[in-house]
Amino acid sequence: MVGRIGYVRTLMQKAKRRFLIALMIPVVAFGCWLRFDQLAQAKAAPINWRDALKQPREWYGSSEALRIADNLIAYQRESGGWPKNIDMAVDLSERLRSDVAKEKRSDDSTIDNGATYSQMIFLARVYTLKQLPRHKESLLRGIDYLLRAQYDNGGWPQYYPIKKGYYQHITFNDEAMMGVMRLLRDVASNQRDYIFVDEARRERAGKAVEKGIECILKAQIVVRGKRTVWCAQHDEVTLVPAPARAYEHVSLSGQESTGIVEFLMGIEHPDPRVIKAIESAVAWFKSAQVKGVRWVETTGTPVDHVVVADQNAPPLWARFYEIDTNRPIFSGRDSVIKYSVAEIESERRNGYRWYTDAPAKLLNRDYPAWLKKVRPGKKWL
C-alpha cells in the first residue's frame, strides 16, 4: 500500500514538473522574442543626419537607409540641389512631408555645411546596393546641378541659384568646394558607387574637376613673391581673397587650406604647377605653427574656451592669419580684428572654431607619403 502511494506521488510530481515546464515555454519564448525584437529595433534605430555617412557599408541596403534616401528625394529642390542645416533623417509625418513638398521651388540649394554633395553620396551608396531607379534619377539631377553651378573660372558659389552677398564668392569655407570636387572626381574616375553614371556626365564631371584645379592654382595667395595658402573665400571674378561674415576677414586660412592641399595630393599625375602649389602650402603650414599652447574648454559655468600655456602641447594652427604679417587674427561680430582670441566677445569666442590641429596629419603623415611617391629622393625637413 505504501509503495503504491509513493508511486502515485512520484507520478504527480512528474506531472507537476511537466505542467510547470509547459507554462514556462511560452514565457521563455516570449522573453527570447522580446529580446530579439529589442535587438532588431536597436539595430534599425533611427539615426541623425550627422551620422548618415558614418554607417557600415551593408547598412545602406537596409530599410532605414531606404527611408532616409526617400526623404532626400522629398527634400531635393527643383534646381537639383538641397538646402542646409536640416535633419533629413527624421521620420516624415504626412503633414511634414506635405510641408516639405511646398518648398520644392525654393532657391535655397547650397553646398555650405556639407549640403547637396552629402545627400548625393548617401544616395549613391543606397543605389549601389538596392538599384532603385528613383534614387539614381535623384543623384543624376544632383550631378547636373553641381555642373550648372560651377563658374566659368572653375570655382563654385556657396548658393546656386546665385544668392547676392558673400554667398556668391568662391567658397572653400567648411570644405564646400572641396566636397563638391571630391564627389565629381569619384564620378569622373568611375568609382564603385558611381559606375552607373553615363559617359557624357562622367566626361563633364572630369572637365569640371580640371577647371576647379585650375581655379585653385590661380587663387593661391602670393605674399612677397612666395606662394602660401588660400582664403576661406575668393572673389568670383578676380580670385583675390574675399571676406564673408563680420568675423571672417580676408586672411590666410589654416583650416580650409588643409582640405585643398589634401585634394591636390590626390591627383594621380600632378604637373609641376600642382607640385609647386602643394610644396609652397606645406612650407607655409610649417611656418605658421602655433606652439607651446593648448586651446581648451573650461569646466566652469558658463563654459569658456581659452588658450593656456603648455610647452609640451602639440602644434596648433589658427583659423585665420593676417596676410601681410602671418599673425593669427580673431574677430567678433563688431568686425574689429584682434590678435588675441581672449579679446573678442564670449559668444563668438565659444561659437566658432578658432584653432585647428588638422594640418598636423598633413605634415606628419600625408605629405611625407605623397613626397615619397611623387618626388622620390627629395628629403622632407
Language-model features, listed with the residues they occupy:
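Bacterial N-terminal signal peptides
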Residues: 22-31
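Long, well-ordered core segments of solenoidal/helical folds
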Residues: 68-80, 138-155, 206-225, 277-294
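Terminal, non-catalytic domain-edge segments
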Residues: 39-68, 186-211, 237-244, 248, ...
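N-terminal carbohydrate-binding/catalytic regions of secreted carbohydrate-active enzymes
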Residues: 66-117
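Intrinsic, low-complexity N-terminal interaction/targeting segments
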Residues: 82-83, 87-88, 96-103, 152-163, ...
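Eukaryote-skewed repeat-based solenoidal scaffolds used as protein-protein interaction platforms
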Residues: 136, 140-143, 147, 164, ...
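Long, hydrophobic/aromatic-enriched structural stretches that serve as scaffold segments
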Residues: 103-130, 138, 142-145
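Solvent-exposed loop and edge beta-strand segments that line ligand/cofactor-binding
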Residues: 53-61, 101-115, 164-177, 243-256
